[in-house]
A protein has these predicted regions:
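Solvent-exposed soluble domains appended to multi-pass membrane proteins
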Residues: 1-176
Length: 176
């Protein structure tokens, strides 16, 4: 579903559902975000602004069968006067955006959310629905569940006692 772009954005052979169309769309998106931020820099409130850029889903048909690659979406938090540039491989979900924003804005008061601040040292986890299946991603591994049984799993360490798998399953079912 990628429209053909005009030069200079049509850098790769176009196809409405090909990798070339996807790469052209990324090239255009990168340019558009850069233009937006450059124009925003002229505003008085730029130094106090937090930009959060993310996607609502991964582009699964260009990904491998690796569940980590299939569900990974980028999150860019840009606030040059507030946050030092860095990258993170931390697990998170869109439910974590609100608590992260609240922390970055240093807001006081109480709020209710199921997410957590992504800038806290905790490595986190992400729960992702995939049709009737629910997935959990953590540093301990990945688990996919039908809410009746485990469908797939990839643990990062041997788990002879089954305690890691049981813990992931319990967390996933409690979250759903």
């Amino acid at each position: 579903p990628f429209v053909e772009l005009q030069p200079p954005f049509n850098q790769y052979e176009h196809g409405s559902d090909t990798e070339g169309g996807y790469l052209n769309m990324l090239h255009y998106t990168d340019w558009a975000i850069g233009e937006f931020i450059e124009k925003f820099k002229r505003r008085k409130d730029f130094d106090d602004t937090i930009f959060m850029i993310t996607a609502d889903h991964a582009l699964a048909h260009f990904q491998s069968n690796d569940p980590y690659a299939r569900f990974r979406v980028p999150l860019i938090v840009y606030a040059p006067k507030l946050i030092k540039p860095h990258s993170s491989q931390k697990f998170g979900a869109q439910t974590d955006l609100l608590p992260t924003i609240i922390n970055l804005l240093d807001l006081e008061g109480s709020y209710a959310t199921i997410g957590r601040d992504l800038f806290q040292p905790n490595p986190g986890f992400a729960v992702v629905k995939d049709g009737a299946l629910v997935n959990i991603f953590t540093p301990q591994g990945f688990l996919q569940h039908s809410l009746k049984q485990i469908v797939d799993k990839q643990l990062t360490r041997e788990d002879p006692s089954g305690s890691t798998q049981a813990g992931l399953e319990k967390k996933l079912i409690a979250f759903d």
